[in-house]
Amino acid sequence: MEHNLLIWGKGGIMVILEFILKNENYLQDLITRSTYHSNAIEGSTLTYAETYAILYNDNSFKIEGKEPREIYEAINHKSALELVFKNLQNDDGFDERFIKRLNETINRNIKETEGFRTVQVFIQGSEHIPPEPEKVPNLMMYYIYNYNHDEQDIFAKIARYHIEFERIHPFEDGNGRTGRLLINYELLKNNLPPIVIAKEDRVKYFEFLRNNDSTGLAEWLKELSAKEEERMKKFGYKG
């Protein structure tokens, strides 16, 4: 990935994104953790070591007995996170095209999809039933418009729109992974540390979504971002 010397965003230079892209050790750490945990939340059986080996061609680690889907999920998530970085570097903005490209990247070689879903979907373990497919385009149009014009507290905004995105469930597959990538898009755009939702926190995370608890989710995301900043400091981030 080509790195710009200075990355400008909302309110000035995106120092944190600049640090991530210039610090190869932290970049690999973030991509591997984000990929491993986001996929594990959705049921992937890859270990952390297997995920790293797939993402960075570590031939010293032998991977056996894994479904091709899981391998593609790892590769695709890395590519999608890099797409987030590229969007921010180029200041391409938050629009329908970007969201669709993220989801298409997540599903590459697994479930080839183009655009929003055309079938009814259901969320396992949730009483909420996402809207009918014919309603999705308009819902997403309003979602994107409101998102781009919302100036509330950043963590409150992220939590509200993450829950709304997951309730719309605009795609046939990959909604969770896409939604979590969008969280980090908004954090980095605002020069805030990214977050990694650990697979161990899967139940807690899903409870926020099931209960439509944007206040609780906002507070938790703020804690995760602060925790990530402490980790970044171990890689040389000065704050």
Regions found by a protein language model. Give the residues of each.
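FIC/Doc superfamily catalytic core
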Residues: 1-173, 177-239
